[in-house]
Regions:
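C-terminal structural segments of small proteins and small subunits
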Residues: 66-91
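Short S/T/G/P-rich N-terminal loop/turn motif that feeds into the first structured element of a domain
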Residues: 1-54, 61-71, 94-97
Length: 97
């Protein structure tokens, strides 16, 4: 498997302050681990069952790199800051060449 695209969909946000602190820590942690942000924010349009909820799309060199970043100390510190302030769904897709 080659490059991987990570899609994170925020199902709900219950604490904006925790989310802000998480984002402050997560962005540099993800970039330092090799993640490249392709898009993030509220969708500009949705169709069918789509919802206007925060979505993040990140490119990784491999699934292993993405998983190592998630498990790494810097990102785990960001997760502790989030502390239940949001419910999210993570998906990993093999990138098309």
């Amino acid at each position: 498997m080659g490059k991987v695209i990570q899609v994170v969909v925020y199902k709900s946000v219950s604490d904006e302050a925790k989310l802000a602190k998480y984002a402050e820590l997560a962005l540099p942690a993800i970039e330092a681990a090799g993640g490249k942000f392709l898009a993030r924010g509220i969708p500009i349009a949705v169709r069918e069952a789509g919802e206007f909820t925060r979505t993040v799309v990140i490119a990784w060199d491999s699934l292993e790199t993405a998983q190592n970043a998630y498990d790494g100390d810097a990102y785990q510190k960001a997760l502790k800051a989030l502390d239940g302030g949001a419910i999210r769904e993570f998906r990993y897709l093999e990138a098309m060449s």
